């Protein structure tokens, strides 16, 4: 069995000990969120079972890991943090928001939309999850394809129970609004 212990989640990554049999090896990765700790643990276990030492595996995480659009930090000159995540399912959105909530000192503001010509049933669920885990939600358009962007937004908003959301169909304007509302620690 492989286990991740003494987990520390930070805005610039995660630190934890990997335990297997009588070994404990520290791992530091630039990936944030518990779901990435689990993903890292699975990768470690797979490599170890193929004969790679835990120490060698741990060293591979020393290099920065940036996966474009996956919990990717956007560095801007501001007293708050900005992340981009491709979360396109209810579970992915929830995982991203839970991870960000754990490292956010202030409010969690999310800008999101759902793509067109895709599963319509997930839209209200994603709206509900966003409203549940974020302090403020800005619903916007996200590649509507051949669908009416306003119809997609209506589907999303139908699942939202909180009043803490805005609808800004133009994505650039939605992002600008989020940035203008963010404060130190958000």
Question: Language-model segments: which ranges?
Answer:
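Nucleotide phosphate-binding/pyrophosphate-handling subdomain across enzymes
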Residues: 11-12, 20-136, 158, 162-164
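C-terminal helical cap/extension that packs against the catalytic core
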Residues: 127-181
């Amino acid at each position: 069995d492989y286990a991740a212990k003494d987990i520390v989640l930070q805005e610039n990554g995660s630190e934890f000990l990997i335990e297997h049999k009588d070994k404990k090896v520290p791992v530091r990765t630039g990936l944030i969120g518990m779901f990435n700790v689990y993903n890292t643990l699975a990768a470690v276990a797979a490599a170890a079972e193929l004969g790679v030492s835990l120490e060698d595996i741990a060293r591979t995480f020393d290099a920065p890991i940036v996966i474009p659009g996956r919990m990717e930090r956007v560095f801007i000159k501001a007293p708050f943090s900005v992340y981009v995540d491709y979360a396109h399912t209810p579970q992915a959105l929830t995982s991203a928001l839970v991870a960000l909530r754990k490292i956010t000192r202030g409010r969690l503001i999310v800008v999101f939309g759902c793509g067109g010509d895709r599963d319509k049933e997930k839209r209200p669920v994603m709206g509900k999850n966003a409203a549940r885990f974020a302090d403020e939600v800005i619903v916007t358009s996200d590649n509507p394809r051949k669908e009416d962007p306003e119809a997609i937004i209506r589907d999303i908003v139908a699942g939202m129970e909180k009043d803490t959301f805005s609808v800004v169909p133009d994505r650039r304007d939605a992002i600008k609004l989020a940035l203008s509302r963010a404060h130190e620690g958000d």
